[in-house]
Design a protein with these regions (language model features):
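Non-catalytic alpha-helical scaffolds and adjoining flexible linkers that form interface surfaces
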Residues: 1-196
């Protein structure tokens, strides 16, 4: 790599991992593309983001080699990427009464609340969270990066977790992602084919 007039040019590189298994599954490939789009949005030129790069590589590896459930890898990437970029939600309890078992998550504020504590006049979308989902969110935000995939939820809760993390990330970034839309259309088609 060399610099010329303030521009850096890479003149040689070596591939460490091609993630070849991703090419065999269109859903995995579209999810990997979504991760790349998010990483591009969260990265700034001339500011290294090694933690985000490591998260991206670990999630690509999780998709390609570990065969983790897609909803789990997606949720891990979305929530941890948000945290690494300064959008860490407050997951310590209801922001009104302090209860450790709130059942709603506000996508705009990143705060938890109990159903009874909700202020009807306040705006924002609140999604229901179970104790298992809440514990998984806390784990993703605060665990050692090497243990990101070492939590377990049943498939319906993993799917709900994925919806919550997606809603939180896209709300915080105030944008949508074309690769995410494509991934969701593939999942919908896949689910329709399985139900027939």
């Amino acid at each position: 790599m060399f610099e010329y007039r303030g521009q850096y040019t890479i003149n040689e590189a070596h591939v460490l991992n091609l993630f070849q298994n991703l090419r065999a599954d269109l859903e995995q490939l579209s999810l990997a593309s979504y991760f790349a789009q998010v990483a591009e949005v969260l990265s700034q030129e001339d500011y290294p983001t090694p933690d985000l790069q490591s998260l991206l590589l670990n999630c690509l590896y999780g998709l390609s080699n570990l065969k983790q459930p897609l909803d789990q890898v997606k949720a891990v990437f979305e929530l941890r990427a948000a945290c690494l970029s300064g959008y860490t939600p407050d997951l310590f309890g209801c922001h009104v009464c302090g209860s450790q078992t709130p059942d709603r998550f506000d996508l705009s504020s990143g705060l938890l609340e109990c159903q009874n504590c909700r202020d009807a006049s306040s705006g924002g979308i609140r999604l229901p969270v179970t104790p298992g989902i809440l514990e998984a969110m806390r784990f993703i935000c605060f665990c050692d990066p090497k243990k990101l995939f070492s939590f377990r939820l049943n498939q319906p809760e993993l799917h709900r977790l994925s919806q919550v993390t997606e809603g939180f990330l896209t709300t915080q970034l105030e944008r949508s992602f074309s690769a995410l839309d494509y991934y969701k259309s593939l999942r919908l088609n896949h689910e329709e084919m399985e139900s027939t």
